[in-house]
């Protein structure tokens, strides 16, 4: 009986324990589901909060951007007002510094970077105006530029007046002048446009040169002459003709080692807004000759950079070479006549600068060279320059002694590539003339041709007359 009771009790206990465990498991599952739901709810809350935070951030960023833009706009407005006030202040400062006087002259840049505006004959003087290195760098200014600007009020300690601001460079706006090409970077080509020297009532010499030895834009011509053959008169006539036929062309007559009365005569005879006479008389130092010639060359280069046509009439390249021969340090080598080879470098650079530019603009140089002066040096200088030009006009002393003017030796005168300058009709007549006159003496040739020129009013009539006379033969 006891054993059965115990068994029943054990079975009940086992049943209770199984139920208990089942309940426990059910409770565990319920707890797990509750936790899952709580986690889901928390995740949803977290997501909602994150979205709210993001929305708040976006809203705050947009508001910040708007605030920043407003601040920037305010700053810009403030800056513009400040700049305007500063500009007005600067203008007031500049206007207070402005002396009211204008500077107008050629710039010479020194090796140290600063420069001076030279006013008279391209040389230093009391009225020169100082130009600061910052102005030279800003506008790409070079030696030879013509500057126009306002002068600052001069203080007691200052030796020279100073340039306050630049108004124009070579007649152009300063920033336009800064963009120009360098002279050395331009492309040289043969002269292909003729400079007509024939005018109404023109002297016979100009008509003869125009036909027998034509001059083109960019010509590098040499007038070879013995003393007292009329070279200075010929240069004067050429300058007059160019100013008459080409009023827009810049003509610079450079007189080196010349007589003072000749300078006055040429200055009074050549008129025109684009004509200049620059001189250094024989009583000046060689340094003076050198400086004047270099300034004239730089002036011409600056004009060519602006695509302008320039003519330099130099009298004479022989005297310029003599001046450099006195200034050049001895190289230890000497040519016949006591000429140092190094002395020819700068005169050759001057003469070689003549060229016609493909990009536009031209520099024409006509230089006189002296021969048979009794000085061996002069003959050596001429021989050195003989092959460098592309046009030669030879004057003959025998003709001048017979008082046959112009004393041009037709057989020895001529232009290279004259086919680019003459018409076919003119070219045929010139060639026929040379053939006809080849066996005669220079004075006989000149007398015959002068008779033909005197019988006609212009070169067109001369060509027709020559055609008729040559056809008869």
Language-model regions, residue ranges each:
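Flexible glycine-/small-residue-rich
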Residues: 14, 107-111, 119-121, 133, ...
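P-loop NTPase nucleotide-binding module
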Residues: 201-258, 297
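Loop/turn positions that initiate beta-strands
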Residues: 144-146, 218, 366
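P-loop NTP-binding catalytic core
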Residues: 152-223, 229
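N-terminal "pre-motor" subdomain/linker immediately upstream of P-loop NTPase catalytic cores
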Residues: 81-177
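Charged, low-complexity terminal tails
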Residues: 1-100, 122
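Phosphate-interacting basic helix/loop segments used at nucleotide- and nucleic-acid interfaces
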Residues: 95-103, 204-208, 296-301, 350
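P-loop NTPase catalytic core
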Residues: 230, 239-242, 251-273, 277-473
């Amino acid at each position: 009986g006891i054993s059965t009771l115990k068994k029943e009790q054990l079975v009940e206990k086992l049943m209770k324990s199984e139920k208990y465990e089942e309940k426990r498991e059910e409770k565990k599952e319920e707890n797990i589901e509750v936790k899952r739901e709580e986690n889901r709810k928390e995740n949803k809350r977290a997501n909602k909060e994150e979205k709210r935070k993001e929305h708040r951030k976006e809203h705050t960023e947009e508001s910040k951007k708007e605030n920043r833009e407003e601040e920037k706009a305010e700053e810009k407005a403030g800056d513009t007002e400040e700049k305007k006030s500063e500009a007005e202040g600067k203008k007031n400062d500049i206007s207070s510094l402005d002396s009211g006087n204008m500077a107008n002259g050629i710039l010479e840049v020194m090796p140290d970077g600063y420069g001076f505006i030279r006013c008279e004959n391209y040389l230093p003087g009391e009225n020169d105006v100082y130009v600061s290195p910052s102005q030279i760098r800003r506008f790409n200014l070079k030696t030879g530029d013509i500057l126009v600007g306002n002068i600052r009020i001069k203080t007691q300690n200052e030796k020279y007046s100073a340039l306050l601001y630049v108004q124009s460079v070579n007649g152009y706006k300063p920033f336009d002048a800064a963009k120009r090409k360098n002279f050395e970077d331009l492309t040289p080509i043969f002269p292909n446009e003729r400079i007509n020297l024939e005018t109404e009532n023109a002297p016979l010499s100009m008509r003869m040169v125009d036909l027998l030895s034509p001059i083109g834009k960019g010509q590098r011509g040499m007038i070879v002459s013995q003393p007292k053959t009329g070279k200075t008169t010929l240069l004067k006539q050429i300058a007059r003709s160019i100013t008459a036929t080409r009023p827009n062309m810049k003509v610079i007559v450079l007189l080196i080692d010349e007589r003072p009365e000749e300078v006055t005569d040429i200055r009074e005879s050549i008129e025109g807004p684009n004509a200049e006479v620059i001189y250094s008389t024989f009583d000046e130092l060689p340094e003076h000759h050198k400086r004047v010639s270099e300034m004239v060359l730089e002036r011409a280069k600056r004009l060519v950079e602006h695509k302008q046509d320039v003519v330099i009439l130099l009298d004479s390249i022989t005297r310029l070479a003599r001046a450099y021969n006195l200034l050049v340090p001895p190289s230890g080598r000497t040519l016949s006549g006591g000429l140092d080879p190094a002395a020819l470098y700068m005169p050759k650079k001057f003469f070689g600068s003549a060229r016609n530019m493909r990009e536009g603009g031209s520099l024409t140089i006509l230089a006189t060279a002296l021969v048979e002066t009794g000085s061996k040096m002069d003959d050596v200088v001429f021989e050195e320059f003989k092959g460098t030009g592309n046009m030669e006009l030879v004057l003959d002393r025998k003709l001048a002694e017979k008082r046959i003017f112009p004393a041009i030796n037709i057989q020895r005168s001529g232009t290279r590539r004259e086919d680019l300058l003459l018409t076919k009709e003119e070219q045929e007549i010139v060639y026929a003339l040379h053939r006809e006159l080849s066996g005669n003496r220079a004075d006989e040739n000149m007398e015959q041709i002068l008779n033909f020129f005197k019988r006609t009013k212009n070169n067109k009539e001369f060509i027709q007359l020559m055609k008729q006379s040559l056809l008869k033969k």
